[in-house]
Amino acid sequence: MTQYIRKLLPLIVLLCVSVAGSPGAWATPTPAADKIKVVTTIPDLAYMVGEIGRDLVEVKSIAKGSEDMHSIPMKPSYLLLLNRADMLFEVGFDMEHAWLPDLLYNCRNEKIQPGAPGFVNCSARIKPVEVPDQPDRAEGDVHPEGNPHYNTDPANGRLTAKTICDGLCGAYPDHAERFEANLEEFLERFDRKLADWEILARPLEGVRVITYHRSWSYFAAHFGLEVCGEIEPKPGIAPTPRHMAKLLRKIRDEKIELVIKEDYYSNKYPRFLKEKSGIKVVTLPNMSGGRPETKGYFNFVEHNITSILRALGKRVLTPEEIEKELNNE
C-alpha cells in the first residue's frame, strides 16, 4: 500500500502545482490572500490555531473528529492542502505515523517538513504516559514515544495551546505580539472552563472503568477515574473469547462500572459485556467535532464529562450550581 501511494502521489503533486492559481481547497476572497495557511492533523489543534491566530490564519484539519487517527484514509485533497500550506501542526508521539510521512514525502513543500519552522510537533510540553521499555510490534500498535491521546486531558490542551503559540511566533515573528496577546486571552477563558470542569467531574473520582482502546489514560488520570483494563488485549488487536471471559470476571470481581468506547469502534464487544454483566457503556468522541455538540475543544471536553456522568446515572450540575461551588471555595 505504501509503495502504491508513493508512486501515485507525485502525479497528484504535478496536478496540484499546475492548478495552483485556480480555485481549490485554499481558494479564498482577495482580503484573505495574505493569511497564513495552516494545516493540522486533528480538529483540536485547528481550533486552538484559530483561537491564537484569529484573522491572521486560515486553518484546516486533515482528520475529522469522528475518524480513527490511526487509520486516516489517504485522499488527494490532503496532498493539495499540504502542498499549499505555510505551516503544519501534528499531535506527535507517533500518532500520525501510519499516514502523515507519506503525505509529507510527496507534497513537495519544504516549508512544512520536520525541522522546518513551519512544522510544529504539539507534544513538546506533554509528559507522556505508557512509554514502552522495549517497543515491540508483537505487542500491538505500540507508540515508542508514549500514549499519543493526550488531547483528552484539558490540562494537556492548555499546554498544547502554548506550544502552538510558540510555533506561530517562531515562524512569523512579526506577528508574535498579537499571537501572544491572543494566547493570553484564550488561556484566561481556558482556566475558567478548567475550574468549572474540576467541579463538574468530582463524582467521577474513583470510578472504575474499562476502555476499548488506550485512548482515555490522560483523561482518567486528570479526573480520577481508574482504568482497570481494555477490550483490546493489545493496542489495535481484536479481543479473543478468552480475553472477553477474563474481562467479565474482572468486571464482576472488581465492581467495574463503565465501558468507554469511541464512535468508530464496533458495539459488538461492549454490548456482550453489558448483556453478560449489566455494566454500563458510553460512546465518546476522542477528538472535537466528532458530533455537532462537540464542535470546539471546550465543548468536546465538557461533552465527555457530562456523557460519563449521565451514563453512570449521576447528576450533572447546572452552570449556576457550578458557579455557586466556585464562590464557596
Per-region residue spans from a language model:
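N-terminal secretory signal peptides that target proteins for export/translocation
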Residues: 1-5
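Bacterial N-terminal signal peptides
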Residues: 9-22
